[in-house]
């Protein structure tokens, strides 16, 4: 045991602790210690290896690490292999940026093989960077052997799963509309589309009804570029549509518009007048044919029979008619399938019109908007700009388009019911994350597009015959090699693309060019990390995962993809319990971004406050499933708590070292936990209380941790440090450590604070692993386990919990607070004693507390006497005040008379009579008035010098009247405080004695300080001598003090000089 620095230096402590962990291989030793324990299988949701971690990533890993440390302290054999998502657009786009590429053509020119190698190196190097960053946050996981989605054995897990889908009839290839990034030239998932506001054209277009002159259907759209692919107009079958004769500049037109929208549409078109000629329902309008206004410019449009159809998604806004292009919209596509419409998509993968786009061929679709608007000519009824939310590619930020393409799909609807039942069978934290949010999302899930038209990813293991179109799915590389007679080792592109397989028809099978959606990659994590399917031993032993946790966006991402893939492969959920956490936002609740200038990095926080403060702040700020609104003031508050913890830990060390204290130990030299149990009944009440408190806290913390309520856990522990330990126990026990002689009381104090600190280290270890390791290292005995993280979790010893004691102490603490409030009202500092404190109560529990803890209550209140009065206090007077809003309705014109009677009456007597009988009768001599409590209120009228405050079930009154004796003690306490501050300024050791010299010119103060008070001052500050002078001139001029200071003590100037005693 050694003394420690007076200030908390987190970065020094954390660097030292992490060095210790590395040199002593503590993580591996903890894992080995638990090797025979029950297995607890955790799967790490893999982050993309794209760069430095951000605050949200840090929160994610800190949350995981805290839970894993907690589980290890329960003796569980925790499977904690880190994971990394190393394929996909996140990596490709970064590499493209490094190489200066703009599109796929640049990649093809560079060479797919060379590009793949650059992606691989990028992913590997950033994996290493991120691992080191996670380690610097104190995160313990298996970073030496993480699962990586680029490894052949991992890739095989995806291949095997797809083969299961194919064999179970869940794999399908079809021509469907998908989200499409024209820059990346690939399909992207719904969850990968990011939305923000953009300006687009908002246009009203007239579609001429076939065979009729000047008669039109009016539609509205924000995507003019999709008009070349129009095949139908949708209406609601129940809406009423009006056939309107509209007049503009003397010309008449017949327009069909939803009846309720006629006026705003015509206003938009600047028509001067109109009349409704007839009406039809949407159902009656269905079947009407019309011509495309662009038919002369797009030959294919002349071949299409354009028809009005009914649809359930049409809303009563704009015109009430929806332009339908099944090749460019999901709802449009589904409607097209239902109604047998053409799925016309004249747009290529880069977003340019193909030859089928007629006059627009070769133009980028969004660039063609203005040309299309111009070509519409008189068919453009009106136009304006609209700001609306529009989707963008999650990686390159390009506005997406919707495009019908050939893709591979998993038929989710076929297994949806099983997925929903598995959601119900899973434990969710919070419950609504699964039972509502995730359940609702899966209920609406459609076929999962698993194919991507890119390069760096897991190649889809489907080989298709060019002759007969038969396909074959390979589940392993070995299976492929056997069929192809090849020796493939790296199943990435372009190597796998070179493998051909003979078809039974005599033709040749070649691999389809697509790669997997990266969400399909990570969906395999729970079995791929166990080596399945190459090795199934660990899988059968451990799967499914006991626990996973990720952000709330993963209900659409990893939670979903895992459940889908696992239902395909094993017909059950891959996880037993799931904790969903929130997003890391700025203080105003905005997403952090460089453009807003509101990004806070984990490194910034660590540089200022250290890792443990960051961890404790993140965990305590809010419930895990709520968004974290990062606030520097909150971090500072947590930092103050950590400093207080350090000071509490530091406080007893000098005394223990001076006294040669060593805590109780067992015969084999280890700390003896049972000593406290054996000695508990002999200990002072305050020691028993803090021991009971920390065990009560331990039980609460354990229950909350089992429900993943980490915010409640960390707040409980911080409150214990601040309120129970620092502001209560340490303040009360401090004088016992100053005792010169050895005594049972001092030993109990040492044993108690050692027990509390060691227990607190264990309770805090999962959340603040560095400071607790440093504290434990200094407190542990030589034969104890070398690390706090090798200790057993303290679940709370019921043998050491005294609920009655805690209740009684709670009364005294509330009394202490009430006294402080009353003193503040009376402007009497706590260091100044008072003669009497009165407690007025009717509560038996309050009376019992003061009966058993009177000495402690007196000491805390700094009072010579406490008087507990049951019922009412005779010196308390009350003034009665009439309540006119009640008196008026009750007594009418007599209200002023009643008011006067109440004001003239004895308020205390009125209050007493109301308490006893519920009513009181007052008379003006001619008439009596019966009043109840609603007719008056009462205000206290305290005697002079007495100030009051309320506490639970009691009122507290402090008599601040000063006597000379009280004044003498008050000044003595003030001088003691100044001398202690001066000792601290000289950095004296606890055992150092000093000589004191005081100049007090005030005659009254000198007369107050009798010998007994001077002895008290010397005793409290280890003063060997204390000389008092009436002026500076009275001092011995030859004596120089190490520290000499002038102090203003309650308006009296006092000069104090101290030196180390010889």
Swiss-Prot record:
It holds the Pfam family Anticodon_1. A motif ('KMSKS' region) lies at residues 591-595. Its main location: cytoplasm. One of its GO terms (biological process) is isoleucyl-tRNA aminoacylation. Transmembrane segments: none annotated. One of its GO terms (molecular function) is ATP binding. Signal peptide: none annotated. ATP binds at residue 594. A motif ('HIGH' region) lies at residues 47-57. It is found in: Cytoplasm. Keywords: Aminoacyl-tRNA synthetase, ATP-binding, Cytoplasm, Ligase, Metal-binding, Nucleotide-binding, Protein biosynthesis, Zinc. Its EC number is 6.1.1.5. Its cofactor is Zn(2+). It is an enzyme of class 6 (ligase). IleRS has two distinct active sites: one for aminoacylation and one for editing. The misactivated valine is translocated from the active site to the editing site, which sterically excludes the correctly activated isoleucine. The single editing site contains two valyl binding pockets, one specific for each substrate (Val-AMP or Val-tRNA(Ile)). Belongs to the class-I aminoacyl-tRNA synthetase family. IleS type 2 subfamily. Catalyzes the attachment of isoleucine to tRNA(Ile). As IleRS can inadvertently accommodate and process structurally similar amino acids such as valine, to avoid such errors it has two additional distinct tRNA(Ile)-dependent editing activities. One activity is designated as 'pretransfer' editing and involves the hydrolysis of activated Val-AMP. The other activity is designated 'posttransfer' editing and involves deacylation of mischarged Val-tRNA(Ile). Monomer. PANTHER family: ISOLEUCINE--TRNA LIGASE, CYTOPLASMIC (PTHR42780:SF1), SOLEUCYL-TRNA SYNTHETASE (PTHR42780). This is Isoleucine--tRNA ligase.
């Amino acid at each position: 045991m050694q003394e420690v620095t007076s200030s908390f230096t987190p970065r020094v402590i954390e660097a030292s602790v992490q060095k210790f962990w590395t040199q002593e291989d503590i993580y591996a030793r903890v894992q080995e210690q638990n090797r025979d324990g029950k297995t607890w299988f955790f799967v790490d949701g893999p982050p993309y290896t794209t760069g430095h971690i951000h605050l949200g990533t840090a929160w994610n890993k800190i949350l995981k690490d805290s839970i894993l440390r907690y589980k290890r302290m329960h003796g569980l054999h925790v499977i904690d292999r880190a994971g990394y998502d190393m394929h996909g657009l996140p990596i490709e786009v970064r590499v493209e940026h490094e190489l200066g590429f703009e599109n796929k053509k640049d990649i093809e020119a560079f060479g797919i093989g060379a590009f793949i190698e650059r992606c691989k190196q990028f992913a590997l190097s950033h994996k290493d960077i991120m691992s080191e960053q996670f380690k610097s946050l104190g995160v313990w996981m298996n970073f030496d052997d993480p699962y990586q989605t680029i490894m052949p054995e991992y890739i095989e897990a995806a291949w095997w799963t797809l083969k299961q889908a194919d064999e179970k009839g869940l794999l399908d290839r079809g021509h469907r509309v998908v989200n499409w990034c024209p820059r990346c030239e690939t399909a992207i998932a719904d969850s990968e589309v990011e939305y923000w506001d953009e300006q687009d054209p908002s246009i009203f277009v007239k579609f001429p009804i076939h065979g009729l002159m000047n008669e039109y259907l009016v539609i509205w759209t924000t995507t003019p570029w999709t008009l070349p692919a129009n095949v139908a107009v949708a209406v609601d079958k129940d809406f009423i549509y009006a056939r309107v004769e509209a007049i503009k500049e003397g010309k008449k037109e017949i327009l069909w518009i939803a009846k309720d929208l006629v006026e705003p549409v015509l206003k938009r078109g600047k028509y001067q007048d109109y009349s409704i000629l007839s009406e039809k329902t949407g159902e009656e309008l269905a079947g009407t044919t019309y011509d495309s206004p662009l038919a002369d410019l797009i030959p294919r449009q002349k071949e299409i029979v354009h028809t009005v159809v009914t649809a359930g998604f049409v809303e009563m806004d704009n015109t009430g008619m929806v332009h339908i292009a099944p090749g460019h919209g999901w709802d449009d596509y589904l409607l097209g399938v239902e109604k047998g419409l053409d799925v016309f998509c004249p747009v290529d993968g880069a977003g340019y019109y193909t030859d089928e786009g007629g006059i627009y061929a070769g133009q980028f679709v969004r660039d063609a908007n203005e040309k299309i608007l111009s070509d519409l000519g008189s068919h453009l009824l009106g136009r304006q700009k609209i700001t609306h939310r529009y989707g963008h590619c999650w990686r390159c930020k390009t506005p997406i388009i919707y495009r019908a393409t050939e893709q591979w799909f998993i038929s989710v609807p076929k297994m949806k019911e099983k997925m929903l039942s598995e959601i119900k069978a899973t434990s969710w934290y919070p419950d609504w994350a699964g039972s509502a949010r995730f359940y609702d999302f899966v209920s609406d899930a459609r076929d999962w597009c698993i194919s991507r038209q890119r390069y760096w990813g897991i190649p889809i293991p489907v080989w298709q015959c060019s002759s007969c179109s038969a396909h074959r799915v390979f589940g392993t590389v070995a299976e492929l090699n056997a069929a192809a007679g090849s020796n493939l080792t790296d199943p990435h592109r372009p190597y796998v693309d070179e493998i051909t397989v003979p078809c039974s028809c005599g033709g040749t099978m070649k691999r389809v060019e697509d790669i997997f959606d990266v969400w399909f990659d990570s969906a395999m994590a729970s079995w791929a990390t166990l080596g399945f399917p190459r090795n199934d031993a660990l899988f059968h032993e451990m799967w499914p995962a006991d626990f996973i946790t990720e952000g709330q966006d993963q209900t659409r991402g990893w939670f979903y993809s895992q459940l889908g893939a696992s239902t395909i492969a094993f017909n059950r959920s891959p996880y037993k319990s799931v904790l969903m956490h929130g997003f890391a936002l700025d203080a105003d609740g905005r997403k952090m971004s460089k453009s807003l200038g509101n990004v806070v990095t984990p490194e910034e926080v660590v540089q200022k406050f250290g890792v443990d403060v960051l961890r404790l702040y993140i965990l305590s700020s809010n419930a895990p499933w709520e968004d974290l609104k990062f606030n520097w003031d909150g971090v500072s508050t947590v930092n103050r708590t950590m400093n207080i913890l350090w000071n509490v830990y530091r406080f007893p060390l000098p005394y223990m070292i001076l006294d040669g204290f060593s805590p109780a130990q067992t015969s084999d030299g280890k700390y003896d936990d049972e000593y406290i149990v054996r000695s508990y009944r002999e200990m002072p009440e305050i020691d028993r209380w803090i021991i009971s408190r920390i065990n009560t806290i331990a039980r609460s913390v354990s229950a909350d941790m089992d429900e993943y309520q980490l915010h409640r856990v960390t707040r409980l522990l911080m409150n214990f440090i601040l309120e129970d330990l620092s502001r209560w126990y340490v303040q009360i026990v401090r004088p016992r450590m100053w005792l010169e002689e050895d005594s049972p009381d001092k030993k109990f104090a040492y044993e108690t604070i050692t027990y509390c600190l060691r227990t607190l280290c264990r309770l805090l270890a999962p959340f603040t692993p560095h400071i607790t390791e440093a504290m434990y290292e200094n407190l542990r005995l030589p034969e104890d386990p070398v690390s706090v993280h090798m200790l057993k979790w303290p679940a709370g010893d019921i043998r050491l919990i005294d609920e009655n004691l805690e209740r009684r102490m709670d009364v005294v603490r509330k009394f202490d607070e009430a006294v402080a409030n009353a003193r503040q009202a009376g402007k009497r500092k706590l260091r100044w004693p008072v003669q009497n404190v009165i407690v007025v109560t009717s509560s038996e529990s309050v009376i019992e507390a003061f009966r058993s803890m009177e000495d402690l209550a007196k000491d805390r209140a700094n009072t010579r006497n406490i008087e507990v009065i049951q019922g009412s206090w005779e010196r308390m007077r009350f003034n009665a005040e009439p309540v006119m809003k009640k008196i008026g309705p009750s007594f009418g014109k007599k209200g002023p008379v009643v008011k006067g009677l109440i004001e003239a009456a004895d308020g205390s007597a009125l209050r007493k009579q109301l308490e006893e009988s519920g009513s009181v009768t007052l008379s003006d001599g001619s008439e009596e008035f019966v009043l109840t409590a609603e007719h008056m209120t009462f205000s206290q009228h305290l005697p002079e010098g007495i100030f009051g405050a309320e506490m639970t079930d009691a009122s507290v009154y402090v008599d601040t009247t000063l006597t000379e004796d009280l004044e003498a003690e008050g000044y003595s306490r003030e001088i003691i405080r100044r001398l202690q501050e001066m000792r601290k300024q000289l950095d004296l050791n606890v055992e150092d004695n000093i000589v004191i010299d005081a100049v007090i010119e005030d005659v009254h103060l000198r007369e107050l300080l009798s010998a007994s008070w001077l002895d008290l001052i010397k005793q409290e500050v280890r003063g060997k001598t204390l000389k008092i002078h009436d002026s500076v001139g009275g001092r011995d001029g030859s004596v120089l003090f190490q520290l000499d200071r002038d102090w203003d003590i309650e308006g009296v100037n006092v000069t104090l000089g101290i030196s180390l005693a010889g």
